[in-house]
Amino acid sequence: MSSDPVPSSFEGNPQFEEETSLQKFRRRLKEEPLIPLGCAATSYALYRAYRSMKAGDSVEMNRMFRARIYAQFFTLIAVVVGGMYFKTERQQRKEFERMVEERKSQEKRDAWLRELEIRDKEDKDWRQRHAAMEAAAAEAGKKTAPHDAARSAIERSEEKSIGVLDAVKELLSRRN
């Protein structure tokens, strides 16, 4: 399995990189500058209406409330037109984000598989070492040296749970 990421049509395009929230805010401000302008106009109209109300100027207050309605309408139109204009770009961005998530999940899966392969290899190595040690022990058990004869007699006698004196007698009887 290759650890290279899946090739993408978005690679090399600086527009489609993971971005911070501040970068996203700046990008959205540059993409649709009319929406913040409409929000600012609405806020200014409300501020002026509030000041007129405090001053007691009802004519100016009514005029500013109408200006607020116009500014909100302008903002709403900017949102709708901007949404229609940037629809394809948003779809591309969603596709890019989906591919990024897919790549990350594939990398996690590959790392998990590598870890499983490493553990499996370690387990096989341990089993081979253990089998080799058992084979060496079995091989050593078949070749008994003369000085091991006494030991094997004692071991056999221990299996029968006889005493030391009986084991020595058995050993002497074998040599004669």
Swiss-Prot record:
Annotated transmembrane regions: 33-49, 69-86
Compositionally biased tracts (Basic and acidic residues): 140-158
Record region (Disordered): 129-158
Compartments, record wording: Mitochondrion membrane
Gene Ontology terms: cellular component: mitochondrial membrane
Subunit-structure text: Associates with the respiratory chain complex III/complex IV supercomplex.
Protein family per UniProt: Belongs to the RCF1 family.
Protein name per its UniProtKB record: Respiratory supercomplex factor 1, mitochondrial
Organism placement in taxonomy: Eukaryota, Fungi, Dikarya, Ascomycota, Pezizomycotina
Gene, per the UniProt record: rcf1
